[in-house]
Design a protein with these regions (language model features):
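Short, Lys/Arg-rich flexible segments
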Residues: 1-88, 98-156
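Hydrophobic alpha-helical transmembrane segments of polytopic membrane proteins
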Residues: 91-95
């Protein structure tokens, strides 16, 4: 579990300079990632509720709603919402791409797109909650979830 970088102290001729730039950059990136994680959970909750009842196949299929997942990439610092095509011990989600984009005999439903576009105001509120905490360092540190840095916890 990485800790935020400590302040850099430079002493010269009795004058001590303290730089918190690295710590501020760390808090900004981690708050951004925490905001993206909560936005993804909110949007996918709506998507999964919409997918469950579209037809008899998805009602019966246990994995129908869990195929929609999110990925938060560390280096790029962005959020991807999408459909994972395979899972351990399950068949492929051949129907998910067709129901999202449309195909012959399958109407375009656009679960992801409509969930995001219909809830832009709520997404802004969620992100504002995290990004307004930048001003207060103690509040920001409490919002950052250090356990998220484990790679096996990234897919929910």
């Amino acid at each position: 579990m990485p800790l935020p970088p400590q302040a850099t102290k430079i002493s010269r001729n009795g004058v001590e300079l303290t730089s918190n730039v690295d710590r501020a950059n760390y808090l900004i990136t981690e708050l951004t990632r925490a905001a993206m994680r909560d936005v993804a959970k909110y949007v996918l909750k709506i998507v999964r509720a919409n997918v469950r009842g579209i037809n008899n196949y998805t009602r019966r299929m246990r994995y129908a709603s869990t195929r929609y997942q999110y990925w938060i990439r560390k280096k790029e610092c962005d959020l991807q919402l999408g459909i994972e095509n395979t899972a351990k011990g399950a068949e492929t989600a051949w129907w998910a791409d067709q129901s999202e984009l449309g195909a012959a005999g399958q109407p375009k439903r656009g679960f992801l797109r409509s969930a995001v576009y219909d809830n832009i105001d709520m997404i802004r509120k969620i992100e504002a909650q995290y990004l307004s905490a930048i001003e207060d360092e103690n509040n920001a540190a409490s919002l950052v979830d250090e356990s998220e840095n484990n790679p096996e916890d990234e897919n929910d």
